[in-house]
UniProtKB/Swiss-Prot annotation:
GO biological process: negative regulation of canonical NF-kappaB signal transduction; Ral protein signal transduction
Domain comment, as recorded: In contrast to other members of the Ras family, the members of the KappaB-Ras subfamily do not contain the conserved Gly and Gln residues in positions 13 and 65, which are replaced by Ala and Leu residues, respectively, and are therefore similar to the constitutively active forms of oncogenic forms of Ras. This suggests that members of this family are clearly different from other small GTPases proteins.
Organism ancestry: Eukaryota, Metazoa, Chordata, Craniata, Vertebrata
Major site of localization recorded for this protein: cytoplasm
Keyword Transmembrane belongs to the record: no
Sequence motif Effector region, location on chain: 35-43
Record's protein name: NF-kappa-B inhibitor-interacting Ras-like protein 1
Binding annotation for GTP: 11-18, 61-65, 120-123
Organism: Danio rerio
Similarity-based family: Belongs to the small GTPase superfamily. Ras family. KappaB-Ras subfamily.
UniProt keyword annotations, A-Z: Cytoplasm, GTP-binding, Nucleotide-binding
Annotated region (Disordered), positions in chain: 169-192
Domain of life: Eukaryota
Length: 192
């Protein structure tokens, strides 16, 4: 198991961030159960990657964002990845995800941080406010992976987190240091 990755889970209040994590990790979330506001929690998960290796994931469950309340700035510097969550039955929550993605891009280099988006409550078809095609088009433009999920079906939660963990823990393919006997780009050659 590697060093572990820090992943910040964020989005508006009541989109189901805590429900997603509790259902994913414990299979214990009851839809409709009364919940209290999350202040901030950390969950530790051991996730099997698509390479068959178990990796540790530290999931930072953040307080739901409301009008005038932003994601605390320290999360931008400590996170290896972000999971942005919206509810398909709340257009405002999707717009907040768009804003969060811009904030992440402003504070971090796109190549150094992994972002994925979850559209939660996809079973609420009759109350849908966020069009799936529109959301996917936005995600493609932002170069992020988007999944629609529901806590009523735990299997919809497993693939996104397995994929995220696999991408965060990919072995480096190239050494940052040149190997003896090989020419590296930008190094003058003595060949004539």
């Amino acid at each position: 198991m590697g060093k572990g990755c820090k992943v910040v889970v964020c989005g508006m209040a009541s989109v189901g961030k805590t429900a997603i994590l509790e259902q994913l990790l414990y299979g214990s979330h009851t839809v409709g159960a009364e919940t209290s506001d999350t202040q901030e929690d950390i969950y530790v998960a051991s996730v099997e990657t698509d390479r068959g290796v178990r990796e540790q994931l530290r999931l930072y469950d953040t307080r739901g964002l409301r009008e005038g309340l932003d994601l605390p700035k320290h999360f931008f510097s400590v996170a290896d990845g972000f999971v942005l969550v919206y509810s398909v039955d709340c257009l405002e929550s999707f717009k907040k995800v768009e804003v969060l993605k811009k904030e992440i891009d402003r504070s971090r280099d796109k190549k150094e941080v992994m972002v994925m988006v979850l559209g939660n409550k996809c079973e609420l078809r009759e109350r849908r406010q966020v069009d799936q095609d529109t959301a996917q088009q936005w995600a493609r433009g932002e170069k992020v992976k988007l999944w629609e999920v529901t806590v009523t079906d735990r299997s919809t939660l497993i693939e996104p987190f397995t994929s995220l963990t696999s991408r965060l823990t990919q072995p480096q393919s190239k050494s940052a240091f040149p190997l003896p006997g090989r020419k590296s780009k930008g190094t003058p050659s003595n060949d004539i």
